[in-house]
């Protein structure tokens, strides 16, 4: 098994605490509402949202795969950090054991925030992660972030 690490950052005009509430803590409800072209539903399979919780994320028709199951690994409300692993569905299967993801939202001096994202692809055997997988993951994250950001800008009273 190999582990391939991919790190990226994304900026937002939304303050870190507000973005954490919307994007991380309420993303299950917000994503299908603001980005139905990317996520059709999120179902809580097991747990209360904290570590160990299992969620099934379903994708719209025409998407490369029907669903993924995520396991919540950490929710740090103080440091705006969230870790989860994709454990089933989507790209996980013959070549990938799991994908571990960590998102940390950091406040910026201008009142916005930076999302620091670390993805670890745990491969089976000597398989390598394809550039298309990383690109698709980054595009999905960017789509969700911009949709949530637009929603928050249009609804200034939400998630304060």
From Swiss-Prot:
PROSITE patterns according to UniProt: PATHOGENESIS_BETVI
UniProt: brassinolide binding residues: 55, 82, 84, 101
Cited SMART domains: Bet_v_1 (SM01037)
Primary localisation category: cytoplasm
Gene3D superfamilies: 3.30.530.20
Keyword Cytoplasm annotated: yes
Any Pfam family: Bet_v_1
Keywords, comma-separated and alphabetical: Allergen, Cytoplasm, Pathogenesis-related protein, Plant defense
One GO cellular component term: nucleus
Subcellular location: Cytoplasm
Domain of life: Eukaryota
GO molecular function: abscisic acid binding; protein phosphatase inhibitor activity; signaling receptor activity
Chain intervals for the UniProt region annotation (Hydrophobic ligand pocket): 116-118, 133-141
Keyword Cytoplasm part of the UniProt annotation: yes
Gene Ontology process terms (BP): abscisic acid-activated signaling pathway; defense response
Tissue: Pollen.
Family: Belongs to the BetVI family.
Function statement: May be a general steroid carrier protein.
Name by which UniProt lists this protein: Major pollen allergen Bet v 1-J
The species this protein was found in: Betula pendula
Gene (UniProt): BETV1J
């Amino acid at each position: 098994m190999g582990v391939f690490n991919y790190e990226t950052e994304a900026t937002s005009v939304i303050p870190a605490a507000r973005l954490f509430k919307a994007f991380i803590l309420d993303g299950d409800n917000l994503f299908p509402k603001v980005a139905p072209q990317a996520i059709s539903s999120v179902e809580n399979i097991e747990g209360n949202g904290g570590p160990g919780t299992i969620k099934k994320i379903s994708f719209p028709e025409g998407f490369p795969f029907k669903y993924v199951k995520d396991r919540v690994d950490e929710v740090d409300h103080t440091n705006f950090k969230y870790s989860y692993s994709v454990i089933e569905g989507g790209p996980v299967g013959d070549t990938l054991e799991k994908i571990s993801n960590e998102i940390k939202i950091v406040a910026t001096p201008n009142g916005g925030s930076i999302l620091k994202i670390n993805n670890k692809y745990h491969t089976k055997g000597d398989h390598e992660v394809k550039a298309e997988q990383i690109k698709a993951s980054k595009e999905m994250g960017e789509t969700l972030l911009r949709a949530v950001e637009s929603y928050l800008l249009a609804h200034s009273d939400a998630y304060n």
